[in-house]
């Protein structure tokens, strides 16, 4: 290659947005023929896994935000003189911010790319944690929580979509489940660190995931499908080549993606009346339905009440018990990550929903029977233990399917030309019902503990029906093949 050719290619690189192209993988593509690619670069699974591990810092931030308010409640209310209602507002503001972030997430990811979207999400997260760390009153505390929620709302849509768009079909399920696995790791870390460090230091530690994410984004390729949709053909093929390995023939996959993009751009403008067509309404219904049912199954209500259940069973340290539940979530989600490309999405969703239904029936029955048993009797103690078993089982079954898979399926089945709008709607619905369950849990539990868990159990039973009748199996299919299923 001549010096002039090198200069020309360098000038072309400078014209392109750095956040979209990165630098190392273009250099690797040019030099691989001269130097020979290393096994690490040549192996597509390693390349894709490295990208997934970097963007997984986003969901870790997501989980850390969710878990932060639990171990810090006593210290924050004491140091800042907050009432219980003021702290409840603090806890719920992340959901409010996430709803706003969810509304914007799809359009941001469509206009500036998946990587640019994650960059935007990281900045308010960092500012939010700093606001909380230096808060002297509720104003900075609330502002920080809102900013965190906004960033998390964008992350919750963008990360599963990015992973689905870069992963090969035989690894997409497992890699897609890393999203929820990272969320549970973030929650567990917040619980664990909250046992040992003050709340202000814990907020400073919350900055780390996004602080590492920002530079990491410059070392991974942009989603090839987004680049293809935007007409950036050279970058699209370079990105895909890096993800599949420099010595892999990507001709077939390139042609499939080009055909899919060409087909979708013919119908680039989608009106609400067009959503009546099966190719749009069916995947939209499935994506929104699963994300709504994920929340209506009551996981947030169960986790919210878990410390009280543990105390009634004689567990002395509710914070330690909460950390134990967080650790169980991580293990169960890791098992799901390993199984999802082997067993399939539908089977895991069905097992998860059936298991959650049975677990919630056990918890509800324990609470109903407690009303007829003396608190001093052995039977009352056994019923308390039974309720703990039911809660733990519910968390395990949720983590096996209904935790990770709705996000995975949403990212897989939404058509390219409505993914931004439809993904925003689905993410907004998930966050809205998360907020609704959190806000109503206390009221429902005050009305009837047994009745509350019965309602959650009925929703989980309906989820079994929903999965059986309407959720398609996406295992082993390319994203382009999935689009053709709905035509």
Curated annotation (Swiss-Prot):
GO terms for molecular function: sugar transmembrane transporter activity. InterPro entries: MFS_dom, MFS_ERD6/Tret1-like, MFS_sugar_transport-like, MFS_trans_sf, MFS_Trehalose_Transporter, Sugar/inositol_transpt, Sugar_transporter_CS. Belongs to the major facilitator superfamily. Sugar transporter (TC 2.A.1.1) family. GO terms for cellular component: Golgi apparatus; mitochondrion; plant-type vacuole; plant-type vacuole membrane. The keyword Amino-acid biosynthesis does not apply. It comes from Arabidopsis thaliana (Mouse-ear cress). Keywords: Acetylation, Membrane, Sugar transport, Transmembrane, Transmembrane helix, Transport. Gene3D superfamilies: MFS general substrate transporter like domains (1.20.1250.20). Disulfide bonds: none annotated. The chain crosses the membrane at residues 46-66, 89-109, 115-135, 146-166, 178-198, 201-221, 284-304, 320-340, 347-367, 389-409, 425-445, 451-471. Sugar transporter. This is Sugar transporter ERD6-like 6. GO terms for biological process: glucose homeostasis; positive regulation of seed germination. It is found in: Membrane. It is a multi-pass membrane protein.
């Amino acid at each position: 290659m001549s010096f002039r050719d090198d200069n020309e290619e360098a000038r072309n690189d400078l014209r392109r947005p750095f956040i979209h192209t990165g630098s190392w993988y273009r250099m690797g593509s040019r030099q691989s023929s001269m130097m020979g690619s290393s096994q690490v670069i040549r192996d597509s699974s390693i390349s894709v896994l490295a990208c997934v591990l970097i963007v997984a810092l986003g969901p870790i931030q997501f989980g850390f935000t969710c878990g932060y308010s639990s171990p810090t409640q006593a210290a924050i209310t004491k140091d800042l003189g907050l009432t219980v209602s003021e702290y409840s507002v603090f806890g719920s503001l992340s959901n409010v911010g996430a709803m706003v972030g969810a509304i914007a997430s799809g359009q941001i990811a469509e206009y500036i790319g998946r990587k640019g979207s994650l960059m935007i999400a990281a900045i308010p997260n960092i500012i939010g944690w700093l606001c909380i760390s230096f808060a002297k009153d509720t104003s900075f505390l609330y502002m920080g929580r809102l900013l965190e929620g906004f960033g998390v709302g964008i992350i919750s849509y963008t990360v599963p979509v990015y992973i689905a768009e870069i992963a090969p079909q035989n690894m997409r399920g497992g890699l897609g489940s890393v999203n929820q696995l990272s969320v549970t790791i973030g929650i567990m870390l917040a619980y664990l660190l909250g046992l040992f460090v003050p709340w202000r230091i814990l907020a400073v530690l919350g900055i780390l995931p996004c602080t590492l994410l920002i530079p990491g984004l410059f070392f991974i390729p942009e989603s090839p499908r987004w680049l293809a949709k935007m007409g950036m053909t050279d970058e699209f093929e370079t990105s895909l080549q890096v993800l599949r390995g420099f010595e892999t023939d990507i001709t077939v996959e390139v042609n499939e993606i080009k055909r899919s993009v060409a087909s979708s751009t013919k119908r680039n403008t989608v009106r609400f009346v067009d959503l009546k067509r099966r190719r749009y309404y069916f995947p939209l219904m499935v994506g929104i339905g699963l994300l709504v049912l994920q929340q209506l199954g009551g996981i947030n209500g169960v986790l919210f009440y878990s410390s009280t259940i543990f105390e009634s069973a004689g567990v002395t340290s509710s914070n330690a018990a909460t950390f134990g539940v967080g650790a169980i979530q991580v293990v169960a989600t890791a098992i799901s990550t390993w199984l999802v490309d082997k067993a399939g999405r539908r089977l895991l969703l069905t097992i998860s929903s059936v298991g959650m239904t049975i677990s919630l029936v056990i918890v509800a029955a324990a609470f109903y029977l407690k009303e007829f048993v003396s608190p001093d009797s052995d039977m009352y103690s056994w019923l308390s233990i039974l309720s703990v078993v039911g809660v733990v089982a519910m968390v395990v079954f949720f983590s096996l399917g209904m935790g990770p898979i709705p996000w995975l399926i949403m990212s897989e089945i939404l058509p390219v030309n409505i993914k931004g709008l439809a993904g925003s709607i689905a993410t907004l619905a998930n966050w809205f019902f998360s907020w609704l369950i959190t806000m109503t849990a206390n009221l429902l539990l005050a009305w009837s503990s047994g009745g509350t868990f019965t309602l959650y159990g009925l929703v989980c039973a309906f989820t079994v029906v929903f999965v059986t009748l309407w959720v398609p199996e996406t295992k082993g299919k390319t994203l382009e093949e999935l689009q053709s299923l709905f035509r």
